[in-house]
């Protein structure tokens, strides 16, 4: 008879980690979106199956905590059909998503399954939805500009390959229009887009009207609409990040877009409050502010490829001190502020240049580029300073040379800042026009 030490390591590891006895529990309490069940041996993050004895229900749920020897679970689907007779069977595994080249052009739900209920080919690999960010010392430095094809960003808010930036805007600020332009024009190999908490009507409209066949060809969409359970909406961000990590591991340059972090945080808030966490700032429990860096730190450069990430944040009443906006801005490497005033004036992309910043721009652009961008910012700031005087007819030409220059060039500057949604501007072309504007 073989002893355990004589069995090969990989087989021994599987035997030790496996459950040789099937464990089943039973639902003991349902409160809102939270289930309680007695299920010995389960772990936080583990998936369990919920089944009724008459096979009228088959649903997955995730363990999110424990209370008085009972497991707290959040279902990954609708609660209808759960009863006091519902059995809980642990799977012994955490949530994983199937990844591979076959995902390009696909629209997935928040759990990584086909949005239309169809079937996907056999995946090349399985990636855990929750995993650690790359170690800080293993990350490559951000040294290369990434052309996003948007003049105002490439010229004045240059984004580096592997950088993480936030797009902050109120409702109607032009976020979706900007995201569609980025998908079409960014010089990357793969784009992964997570649409979290969007209205169902807007999803197909965005795919067919804004994104188009060309944009979808090199993209993967993860969609969790506003009517989906909170766990699916929260998981959508992690699923999209895992898919982006797979393509990064294949040596590709990946653009990860998430719309929006605010709705992701609201889903996390629902889960945290259901689990009994105390509400803190604006009703958000502590787990929300722990989840944000855990999600965002996974983007960036690795030794093989890169994930450049842009996260949209809904700002209520232009309040940048709102908890989610404030926390997100402190985590990311830059912020792009969209202005409702510019959007109302049909100025797209509606980016408020003077309130926006890229924290790595000075390290990745040439000395000349830095000078031209600084000169244009000064002209915009000077024009904003004298704009009210111009409107009331009190400005006297000749009193301020720089103000005269700003007034003279503002038309050309605004023309350069505006860009059609289907208009592509290459990086070198953007720099040439920027140089012309500031000479």
Curated annotation (Swiss-Prot):
One of its GO terms (molecular function) is proton-transporting ATP synthase activity, rotational mechanism. Disruption phenotype: Deletion mutant secretes neither Yops nor the ruler and needle subunits. It catalyses: ATP + H2O + cellular proteinSide 1 = ADP + phosphate + cellular proteinSide 2. Signal peptide: none annotated. Its EC number is 7.4.2.8. One of its GO terms (biological process) is protein secretion by the type III secretion system. The keyword Transport applies. It is found in: Cytoplasm. GO terms for cellular component: cytoplasm; type III protein secretion system complex. The keyword ATP-binding applies. Changing residue 175 to E: Lack of activity. ATP binds at residues 172-177. Its main location: cytoplasm. ATPase activity is negatively regulated by YscL/SctL. It holds the Pfam family T3SS_ATPase_C. It comes from the Bacteria. Keywords: ATP-binding, Cytoplasm, Nucleotide-binding, Plasmid, Protein transport, Translocase, Transport, Virulence. ATPase component of the type III secretion system (T3SS), also called injectisome, which is used to inject bacterial effector proteins into eukaryotic host cells. Acts as a molecular motor to provide the energy that is required for the export of proteins. Required for type III secretion apparatus (T3SA) formation, proper protein secretion, host cell invasion and virulence. May play a critical role in T3SS substrate recognition, disassembly of the effector/chaperone complex and unfolding of the effector in an ATP-dependent manner prior to secretion. The core secretion machinery of the T3SS is composed of approximately 20 different proteins, including cytoplasmic components, a base, an export apparatus and a needle. This subunit is part of the cytosolic complex. Forms homohexamers. Interacts directly with YscL/SctL (stator protein). YscN assembly requires the presence of YscC/SctC (the secretin), YscJ/SctJ (the outer inner ring protein), YscQ/SctQ (the major sorting platform component), YscK/SctK and YscL/SctL. Interacts with the Yersinia outer protein R (YopR) in a secretion signal-dependent manner. Belongs to the ATPase alpha/beta chains family. T3SS ATPase subfamily. This is Type 3 secretion system ATPase.
């Amino acid at each position: 008879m073989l002893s355990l030490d004589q069995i090969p390591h990989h087989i021994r590891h599987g035997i030790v980690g496996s459950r040789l006895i099937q464990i089943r529990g039973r639902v003991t309490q349902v409160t809102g979106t939270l289930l309680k069940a007695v299920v010995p041996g389960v772990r936080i993050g583990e998936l369990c199956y919920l089944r009724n004895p008459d096979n009228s229900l088959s649903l997955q749920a995730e363990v999110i905590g424990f209370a008085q020897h009972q497991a707290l679970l959040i279902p990954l689907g609708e609660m209808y059909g759960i009863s006091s007779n519902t059995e809980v069977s642990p799977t012994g595994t955490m949530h994983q998503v199937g990844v591979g080249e076959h995902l390009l052009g696909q629209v997935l739900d928040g759990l990584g399954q086909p949005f239309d209920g169809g079937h996907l080919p056999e995946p090349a690999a399985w990636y855990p939805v929750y995993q650690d960010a790359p170690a800080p010392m293993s990350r490559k430095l951000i040294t290369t500009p990434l052309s996003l094809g948007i003049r105002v960003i490439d010229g004045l808010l240059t984004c580096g390959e592997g950088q993480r930036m936030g797009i902050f805007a109120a409702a109607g600020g032009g976020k979706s229009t900007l995201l569609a332009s980025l998908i079409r024009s960014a010089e990357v190999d793969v784009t992964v887009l997570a649409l979290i908490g969007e209205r169902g009507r807007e999803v197909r409209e965005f795919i067919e009207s804004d994104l188009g066949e060309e944009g979808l060809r090199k993209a993967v969409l993860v969609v969790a609409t506003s009517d989906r359970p909170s766990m699916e909406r929260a998981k959508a961000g992690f699923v999209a990040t895992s898919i982006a990590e797979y393509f990064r591991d294949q040596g590709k340059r990946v653009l990860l877009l998430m719309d929006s972090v605010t709705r992701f945080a609201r889903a996390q808030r629902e889960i945290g409050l259901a689990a009994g966490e105390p509400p803190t700032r604006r009703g958000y429990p502590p787990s929300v502010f722990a989840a944000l860096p855990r999600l965002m730190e996974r983007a960036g450069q690795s030794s093989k490829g890169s994930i450049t990430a842009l996260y949209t944040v809904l700002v209520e009443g232009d309040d940048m001190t709102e908890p989610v906006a404030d926390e997100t801005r402190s985590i990311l490497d830059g912020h792009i502020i969209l202005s409702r005033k510019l959007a109302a004036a049909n100025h797209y992309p509606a980016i408020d240049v003077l309130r926006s910043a890229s924290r790595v721009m000075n390290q990745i652009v040439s000395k000349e580029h830095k000078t031209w961008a600084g000169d244009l910012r000064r002209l915009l700031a000077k024009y904003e300073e004298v704009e009210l005087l111009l409107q009331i007819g009190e400005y006297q030409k000749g009193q301020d040379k720089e103000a005269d220059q700003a007034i003279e060039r503002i038309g050309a500057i605004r023309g350069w800042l505006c860009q059609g949604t289907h208009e592509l501007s290459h990086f070198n072309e953007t720099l040439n026009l920027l140089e012309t504007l500031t000479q």
